[in-house]
Amino acid sequence: MDLKVLREEARSILIDVVERSAIKKGQLFVLGLSSSEVLGGRIGQHSSLEVGEVIVKVVLEELSSRGIHLAVQGCEHINRALVLEESVAEEYQLELVNVLPSLHAGGSGQLAAFKYMKQPVEVEAIAAHAGLDIGDTSIGMHVKRVQVPLVPIQRELGGAHVTALASRPKLIGGVRARYQPDPIRK
């Protein structure tokens, strides 16, 4: 796999999702990543630290430049806990959990986040404003309601299926109510 191509495709997909999701500075963005799927394998079977590092690094760079906070979801073996910066956990008053990810318990994305973040910590759950799912890792449990599916500009990254979610406030009030314009579905 050409890692330069992977980096640029990941960047392109992320920028598309960020711009269409209407996520704002200071908000949370969740990344689910199966490096096994990116390499054309089955989720959890052929994890690649190198692939995880390439993707997480570019996602972290792009989000940081916009002031958006990254949370990287781990695999089911650590109950889909998330790694993010300690300052973000404090800002959002998130409860910390004690686990150190490994390649087969947490995954390559979490290991990469521990490498590239300044003060990484693990939390059990978040309510992110948007997210990117590379390899069908099921990020929905960590995206706030109401979730809005986004079809990325590119539906595959390597061998991995790619999906994304944005979120919007609930529409309440019924037929007599009026609503603010929807920034996601312009």
Curated annotation (Swiss-Prot):
It comes from the Bacteria. Gene3D superfamilies: Hypothetical protein TT1679 (3.40.50.10360). Belongs to the UPF0340 family. It holds the Pfam family DUF436. It comes from Streptococcus equi subsp. zooepidemicus (strain MGCS10565). HAMAP family: UPF0340. This is UPF0340 protein Sez_1726. InterPro entries: Antibiotic_NAT-like (IPR028345), DUF436 (IPR006340).
